[in-house]
Amino acid sequence: MASSNFFLLIPLIALVTTQAMASDPSPLQDLCVADKNSPVRVNGFPCKDAKDVSVDDFFLAANLDKPMDITKSKAGSNVTLINVMKLAGLNTLGISMARIDYAPKGQNPPHTHPRATEILSVIEGSLYVGFVTSNQANGENKLFTKTLNKGDVFVFPEGLIHFQFNPSYDKPAAAIVALSSQNPGAITIANAVFGSNPPISDDVLAKAFQVDKKAVDWLQAQFWENNHN
């Protein structure tokens, strides 16, 4: 009987192990340039025919050496993301990158990347950065923060809420980040909660945030911008 139970556990252990190690699927060939015009729907993109692949599928004149416009952002930041939607050669490679520009006192608001770990390096100015852990057994969510200067590096674990803030009153800041997914996704917390379409019931949000409905209605009436480009 014990032997029988052991063999029943083997597929369960295999399933749990597979789920724990899940990420962007590894490439099974040298190249799989995304064919965005294909009618086939898969997790990611199907491969372009190899005979139609060119060097330009792996190149993008992204101008990441130049500061991006931050004057129109209410958050005071601009995220220029280079993912598989912009660079088809990233398909199946499990990586993307971005440049983030911050106005004085600007921020990249609290957000998560549901499919990626992020590593950031400051290339101009200073940044106050941090992330919050998932719900712990003691009911707490621990905050980890650090002030970074030019050349410093910081990593944000996959799926955790994190932020960056430029503490300077008069100097801009900038960073380059790499992400462990061809399409990491971004969920800006305030935008998702108060700017969803259709809106989340104010009964739900008033209870969740322990405020009255007027406060929720006011927040939902604001313009929640997307600072990702």
From Swiss-Prot:
Q: Where is the Cupin type-1 domain?
A: 62-217
Note whether Transmembrane occurs among the keywords. no
Q: Name one GO cellular component term.
A: apoplast
Q: Which cysteines are joined by disulfide bonds?
A: 32-47
Task: Look up the domain of life of the source.
Answer: Eukaryota
- Location within or outside the cell: Secreted, Extracellular space, Apoplast
Q: Matching CDD domains, A to Z?
A: cupin_OxOx
Give the matching InterPro entries.
Cupin_1 (IPR006045), Germin (IPR001929), Germin_Mn-BS (IPR019780), RmlC-like_jellyroll (IPR014710), RmlC_Cupin_sf (IPR011051)
Q: Which UniProt keywords apply?
A: Apoplast, Disulfide bond, Glycoprotein, Manganese, Metal-binding, Secreted, Signal
Q: Where does the UniProt entry place glycosylation sites?
A: 78
Family of this protein: Belongs to the germin family.
Q: What does this protein do?
A: May play a role in plant defense. Probably has no oxalate oxidase activity even if the active site is conserved.
Assembly and interactions?
Oligomer (believed to be a pentamer but probably hexamer).
Task: Output this protein's name.
Answer: Putative germin-like protein 12-3
Q: Which organism is it from?
A: Oryza sativa subsp. japonica
